């Protein structure tokens, strides 16, 4: 059952707003902290703008920052004052291990629950394209044929022949 607006956690509100921004502007890789805060005020999901939104966008929800009372992994800091939604495969502060990544379906307000399905697809596609775009990961397996006829131990022995 969708949650009442008054019961919506600030962290869940921040996640919803960030998801709305990503869905509306898929060409943008990330957003300024101020954009997220402004969109939260504009959406007014839980009523008038709440003062905790800013600190959640800056600190509490940011996976790759040391936790400060909250261990959420909902956002990822891409640069100074820049955020995007966290996705599996992103690095995060070790103390945030096991932290909440998305709102629970039963905690989503009416009209926003489809964002969870959108997020699963977006996150999956983003992971695939990140792997394909990474030049180091693209090299995986490229040298396999170089050593296909020689074991690693034999190769090292051959290299060391004649040392001393």
For the regions a protein language model found, what residue spans apply to each?
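Phospho-regulated, low-complexity intrinsically disordered regions of nuclear gene-regulatory
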Residues: 2-21, 47, 51-138
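DNA-recognition alpha helix
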Residues: 17-21, 32-46
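Short aromatic-glycine motifs in intrinsically disordered, low-complexity regions
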Residues: 23-26
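Flexible coil/turn residues that form the inter-helical turn or adjacent wing/linker of helix-turn-helix
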Residues: 29
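Short coil/turn segments at secondary-structure boundaries
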Residues: 32, 70-74, 152
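Short linear interaction segments
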Residues: 131-164
């Amino acid at each position: 059952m969708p949650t009442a607006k008054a019961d919506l956690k600030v962290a869940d509100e921040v996640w919803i707003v960030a998801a709305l921004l990503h869905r509306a502007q898929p060409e943008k890789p990330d957003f300024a902290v101020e954009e997220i805060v402004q969109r939260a005020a504009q959406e007014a999901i839980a009523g008038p703008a709440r003062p905790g939104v800013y600190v959640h966008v800056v600190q509490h929800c940011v996976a790759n920052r040391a936790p400060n009372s909250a261990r959420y992994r909902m956002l990822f800091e891409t640069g100074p004052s820049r955020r995007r939604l966290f996705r599996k495969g992103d690095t995060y502060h070790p103390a945030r291990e096991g932290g909440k990544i998305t709102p629970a379906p039963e905690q989503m307000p009416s009209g926003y629950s489809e964002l969870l399905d959108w997020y699963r697809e977006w996150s999956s596609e983003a992971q695939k394209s990140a792997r394909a775009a990474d030049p180091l990961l693209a090299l995986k397996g490229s040298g396999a044929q170089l050593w296909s006829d020689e074991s690693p131990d034999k190769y090292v022995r051959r290299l060391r022949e004649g040392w001393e």
